[in-house]
């Protein structure tokens, strides 16, 4: 049995055809999934923005239950649930990056997690503030930051950055 070096444990690599080596294959998979979910989140958010009409923020006797039975709220719920899954995935990716001990990966995945959380908080504030456009803008900035940082994380995990 051969001894396992620290480099093998903390920076696994995978050789592809053509001599391309992936430095962190697990992180490449996780960040790729993040990017796919961010794209789904964008499409759902645009649908909600264009086609869902929100009622007044003053809730009646049944409060939020009445709000959820409005037309188009299924898309809002899908948007919210995708955001929660995305938040959990970015936290998992951040933890995996911390195990890799790569400072740049830790910074980019941590930034992605922070951007997703900021976008989610802005989304909740948007929903409960009477659709204040500042919170909608906050969601869009959070999305842009998360997408850019996730793409940068993918490049670093792939071995293109140091």
Protein language model features and the residues they cover:
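Polytopic transmembrane helical bundles with strong interfacial aromatic enrichment
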Residues: 2-162
């Amino acid at each position: 049995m051969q001894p396992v070096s620290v480099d093998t444990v903390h920076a696994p690599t995978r050789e592809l055809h053509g001599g391309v080596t992936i430095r962190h294959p697990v992180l490449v998979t996780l960040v790729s999934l993040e990017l796919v979910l961010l794209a789904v989140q964008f499409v759902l958010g645009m649908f909600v923005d264009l086609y869902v009409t929100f009622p007044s923020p003053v809730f009646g006797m049944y409060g939020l239950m009445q709000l959820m039975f409005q037309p188009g709220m299924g898309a809002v719920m899908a948007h919210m649930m995708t955001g929660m899954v995305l938040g959990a995935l970015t936290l998992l990716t951040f933890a995996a990056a911390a195990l890799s001990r790569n400072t740049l990966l830790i910074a980019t995945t941590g930034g992605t997690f922070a951007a997703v959380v900021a976008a989610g908080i802005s989304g909740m504030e948007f929903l409960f503030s009477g659709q204040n456009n500042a919170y909608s803008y906050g969601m869009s900035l959070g999305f842009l930051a998360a997408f850019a940082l996730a793409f940068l994380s993918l490049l670093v995990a792939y071995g293109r950055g140091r």
